[in-house]
Amino acid sequence: MNFPWDQLLVQGNWMITMGQIGAPFAVIAVIAVISYFKLWKYLYREWFTSIDHKKIGAMYLICAVLMFVRGGIDALMMRTQLAIPDNTFLEGNHYNEVFSTHGVIMIIFMAMPFIFGLWNVVVPLQIGARDVAFPVLNNVSFWLFFSGMILFNLSFIVGGSPAAGWTNYAPLAGEFSPGPGVNYYLIAIQISGIGTLMTGINFFVTILRCKTPTMKFMEMPMFTVTTFITALIVILAFPVLTVTLALFTTDRIFDTAFFSVANGGMPMLWANFFWVWGHPEVYIVILPAFGIYSEIIPTFARKRLFGHQSMVWATAGIAFLSFLVWVHHFFTMGNGALINSFFSISTMLIGIPTGVKIFNWLFTLYKGRVTFESPMLFALGFIPNFLIGGVTGVMLSMAAADYQYHNTYFLVAHFHYTLVAGVVFACLGALIFWWPKMTGFKLNETLNKWCFWLFMIGFNVCFIPQFILGLDGMPRRLYTYMPEDGWWLLNAISTVGALLMALGFMFLVASIVYSFFKAPREATGDNWDGLGRTLEWATAGAMPPKYNFAITPDWNDYDTFVDMKEHGRHYLDNHNYTDIHMPNNTPVGFWMGILFTIGGFFLIFETLVPAIICLIGIFATMVYRSFQIDHGYHIPASEVAETEKRLRDARIKEREAVSHES
């Protein structure tokens, strides 16, 4: 085994050196805290090996928030570098590493796990299910994502991060990027992507087979509809990424030539394959965000969602068109007028179903009794900001104009107005909105609103100047510029905006910490003053029991829960309980994740023998699980009845306390 020890440690940069020193101490500190409080057995039994969709969702969300912090630090480093001309805060290659990892982390390791975490927490509850269709696969999916996340973040201090951009274009990412950096990109995303594909299959089947029998597709909550359609996009798009990453991996490790011109390959093949996955990937994160807004807006407008069926068809239309627009990412690569014209038109067409959604949200607000809780503020802030992203997207869809905009900060501002205003606003609003379902208490509304206003104002202060910089000719991926370029003031303003966004997020962290210690614990499952409109708010307690629902709920309309409350069937009380079957926890996913991490690390450094041994271990684990007889366990009806009575008594006590105070 010839391990390249000379490539292991990155040298010559003080920030990376500090990371190399600090990371081991951070790991030791975490291990020490867990050991001091004797939590290892609890974490392993109740979390690491759990197949409970709610706990898996919480683990996804914890990782996503941590990656939001990591990606945000990358963004602040870039904005600090560009705040003044001729800055030496970051040297050129380090800047390239930072913006490359920023893009990958924010899309692959923040936005997607955030969405998947919400899927896990909310969707089974919304469809009246006890768990997902494949609970063990759900656990495996999480640990594969976690493995990819660990490997990708390890690159900063061990071996060096990828520096060819988040798109990793050949030939720059091929023969012109020696070392393990690009290998980290290929292997980490490959492992995480396999987990993502499993998640897509799991939720597609869950919604088809596990929803309450009376729930019809066109009557499902919009978040569930968008989850179903997004899961289908995942199933269709991610195999393309899997194959493409595998081909590039063989180029780098086994000297094949799929993407190398010198040996008969075609770099443009990578661009096509990448964006055949890459543009549907945008809708993998934005469609569930649309579903989130379709839950929040009717709740705080106290009104039915306007045009529910048209929203379903619009979602399906966007999903279909998402596979027909990938060439607009490289209009400038010389495809020819006919091809560019086709993809220009198909890109513009996406504005039609998206416009339908915008107007439906506005009509939902019209004559509604709107209240401005913090989730609603994020939803309302989304509409005008996302509209800016949409309008500039139509500008970029014109192939002739794209030649002017494409390689400038105008494009950077555009996609941040779609992804931040569309996805990040949704994630933050959803975290606050569904927080009581995970913890049993609400976050502090005052701090939440400070978070919203600082984040939204900072967002516009950060990215509106970038539109102007782009029109003035500032290229993207530029790590420094000269004073005579005249870009200093707008870059400085943009940096101030980024700092405001960071400050806003710190208010959300403060809200979480403050509420953990100070917020009253709630008993009701309908946490937002009884405004809930879907089944996740119909659980017997604020935090659903492990079986979710003691009896299978009925669902006859997308606002059935409102009707249930009007007729006094709010909590599905029933004394004819039966035994409930539940699956057992499993260690399979956890150990597969460890094997993927170790094997992936050795493959990144092109040390094949240990990687092959780990691969054999992975297959052995799968075989072991395949022959394991596990019938799960049953929760006795008496225990269900006792749990439901305890939760019912807590609700009554809480209601009496509120009545006494008023």
From Swiss-Prot:
Sequence position, cross-link 1'-histidyl-3'-tyrosine (His-Tyr): H279-Y283
Any one of the GO CC terms: plasma membrane
Gene for this chain: qoxB
UniProt-annotated binding residues for Cu cation: H279, Y283, H328, H329
Record-given protein name: Probable quinol oxidase subunit 1
Annotated organism of origin: Staphylococcus saprophyticus subsp. saprophyticus (strain ATCC 15305 / DSM 20229 / NCIMB 8711 / NCTC 7292 / S-41)
GO aspect biological process, one term: electron transport coupled proton transport
Superkingdom, taxonomy of origin: Bacteria
Cleaved signal peptide residues: none
Cofactor binding remark: Binds a copper B center. Heme A3.
Pathway terms, separated by semicolons: Energy metabolism; oxidative phosphorylation
Keywords assigned: Cell membrane, Copper, Electron transport, Heme, Hydrogen ion transport, Ion transport, Iron, Membrane, Metal-binding, Oxidoreductase, Respiratory chain, Transmembrane, Transmembrane helix, Transport
Classification via CDD domains: Ubiquinol_Oxidase_I
Function recorded in the entry: Catalyzes quinol oxidation with the concomitant reduction of oxygen to water.
A matching Pfam family: COX1
